[in-house]
Amino acid sequence: MSASTVSITASPRTIRRTPVLSGEKKSNFDFPPSESHANAAIGESSAGTNKDLIRAEAAGERSNTYDVGPVTRKSGSTATGTNTTTTQRRTRKSQGNKIDRGKWKTVVRVFAKQFGALLLLVGLIQLIRKLTLKDSSLSSSNFPIETEMVLSELESRISAVDGLVKTTTKMMQVQVEFLDKKMDSESRALRQTIDSTSSVLHSELKKVESKTERLQVSVDELNAKPLVSREELERVYEELKKGKVGDSDVNIDKLRAYARDIVEKEIGKHVADGLGRVDYALASGGAFVMGHSDPFLVGNGRNWFGTSRRRVHSKAVKMLTPSFGEPGQCFPLKGSNGYVLVRLRAPIIPEAVTLEHVSKAVAYDRSSAPKDCRVSGWLGDIDMETETMPLLTEFSYDLDRSNAQTFDIADSAHSGLVNTVRLDFNSNHGSSSHTCIYRFRVHGRELDSVSVAHA
């Protein structure tokens, strides 16, 4: 048994001893060097007093429980036989434990602060979330009403557009049906017109074919028969005998040859432009129209001044070309009086002029034929307004004669050379609106170079 144990058990229980501590007072909690410097301003006396009071209370409680005296530690020497009481000092191990405990307290304190800040932040987030959800709930409560209004307005607009589309479609269908009916009726009318026109043309072609057949038959008959029959020759012979012509002077074969020559000459005349005379006013030979009075034209033909530099209409050339007796192949001039100015293909001595109109056998109306006419001619250029135009001939066109009527120039030898001829007409056969010129011809003879030089 140790000496400390003996001292505790030997003390009577009734005696309460005051614990006396000896030795150096030290703090129960060793601060780190940084903290000890920071707390130096507070004071060491108050800290040490508080810690001594805590330590005294703890010792009193232990003494009341166990009735023991102060714990002392006796040390002796076997050599001297003496005991030494000393206060137990804290080892460096216990001081190391206190430093670790202080670090843990700092960590816990920092953690507690961070945790509190985290809790505060979480609370703020929850509060903001509740407010946001509340606002969204309020706005969502109004959303269905606005949505219904928008949807109803959209439905009304869609229905209006649908009605407009239906109405437009119906109108387009009506227009299409109307156009279809109109096109159908017009196509039927056009088809009927074409059919009627084709039937008329077909009938006219049949008439032409029949006429052609009759003409062919007539030509064949003429070719089969002699030009002069024997009966006609005998009749001519009897007449010649009555005219006191001797038999020695008359021969039937000679008469037949004479008649043949006459017929061939007449046929040659008709083949040679119908007259058998040279036309120096023929357009294909080099002649042309230099001017004319106002033409009688309708429709697009009214604008005729821009067609030529000489203010001559493009259709005026018809007056200098063969018409072949076809109605309408003429150049109409306005009114019952007018003129035509023609430049001949070459200078000539004029002998006659020919004025042609449509034949009575094929004409629809001959009231537009010219009546009283006057022809002038000269060589070169003259001023028709100031100078007198030399007169060649005057005549009247007669409807009872042939369609191509020739009028001779009485004094052609004294007229001299001419290369320009003017036809003036002062009246026609009844038409007040226009006068038609089918063809105008000028006949004469050219002089050779020697004659022209002497002239």
UniProtKB/Swiss-Prot annotation:
Residues 74-88 have a biased composition (Low complexity). It comes from the Eukaryota. It comes from Arabidopsis thaliana. It is found in: Nucleus inner membrane; Cytoplasm, Cytoskeleton, Phragmoplast; Endoplasmic reticulum membrane; Nucleus envelope. Keywords: Acetylation, Coiled coil, Cytoplasm, Cytoskeleton, Endoplasmic reticulum, Membrane, Nucleus, Phosphoprotein, Signal-anchor, Transmembrane, Transmembrane helix. This is SUN domain-containing protein 2. Expressed in roots, hypocotyls, cotyledons and leaves and inflorescences. Signal peptide: none annotated. Residues 129-455 are perinuclear space. GO terms for cellular component: endoplasmic reticulum; endoplasmic reticulum membrane; nuclear envelope; nuclear inner membrane; phragmoplast; spindle. Residues 201-225 form a coiled coil. Gene3D superfamilies: Galactose-binding domain-like (2.60.120.260). Residues 2-105 are nuclear. Induction: Up-regulated in proliferating tissues.
